[in-house]
Amino acid sequence: MRWAQIKDSKGSRAVCFFEETVYELPAKLSPLLNFYSRFRLNFGDPKNAVAILKENGATVMGHGEELWNSLPFIRPLDKPGKIVCAGLNYRDHAAEMNLEVPEHPALFAKFPNALIGPGEQIRMPADDGTGSTKVDWEVELCLVVGARLRNATEEQALDALMGYTVMNDVSVRDWQGRSSEWFQGKNWDAMTPFGPVIVSPDEVDPVAGLELVCEVDDVVRQRGTTADMVFTPAQLLSYISRFMTLEPGDLVATGTPAGDRKSTRLNSSHRL
């Protein structure tokens, strides 16, 4: 099952794609997270999923991938709570930086002010008057938490996962390097593209390997596989839940693979 939010002349609302059918959820069931949290335990059975959608007023928009991919997507969650990010979580990325892989997850935080949806303009620091031009990209698999987690086992963590989406941790490197903490290079307003689709865990397996690709003006600048992760999604969620309660709608970005970030710096004319 795939979840998303769209916006058109009728406003914004949630949609889902299940068994080649596109369903539109009524406005009363939006935002998406509220609907999912209410019924998540029943979505494991396909028959239950269809029944729940119909019983709650979901209507069929049509069928097929072509229709789904043509929808006017916006970011899938309006206001995520916590955004926890893992650094150095790909072996090839650590190697290209001449660093050892961490013994424990290297974590930092983002805030919702940084997020934008698909197709939105990244607010470049140079355009804000800071003069910074050392901006580049980090494509990442992002976990969307679907249920509360505290001191969770890896199995419990996966059971609480709503699904997977994509995030690009666009970073301002000169500001990031001003201290040993990465915070100020990672939290600029409107610099982190997120979404558009949340894919349920039964459809993909990051441990087996999902390809991550980042293109700048149609040129591939990063290509990696989630099979290269140091800490798996289950391990990250379980680890974080040992010291912090994760709530529905929280995001965990799982790190970025190696790539070419230095030959071209991102500017407002580029398409990421």
Positions of the model-derived regions?
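Catalytic-pocket segment enriched in acidic/His residues
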Residues: 9-10, 50, 66, 70-72, ...
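Residue-level marker of beta-strand positions
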Residues: 2, 82, 121, 140-142, ...
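Short, structured patches in soluble enzyme cores that scaffold and shape functional sites
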Residues: 7, 110-112, 126, 137-147, ...
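Flexible glycine-rich active-site/ligand-binding loops centered on an Asp-His dyad
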Residues: 100-103, 107-111, 156-184, 188-189, ...
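Structural signature of FAD isoalloxazine-binding scaffolds in flavoprotein oxidoreductases
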Residues: 101-118, 135-137, 265
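A generic local secondary-structure boundary/capping motif
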Residues: 4, 73-75, 95-98, 122-135, ...
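N-terminal non-catalytic cap/leader segment that marks the start of a structured domain
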Residues: 1-105
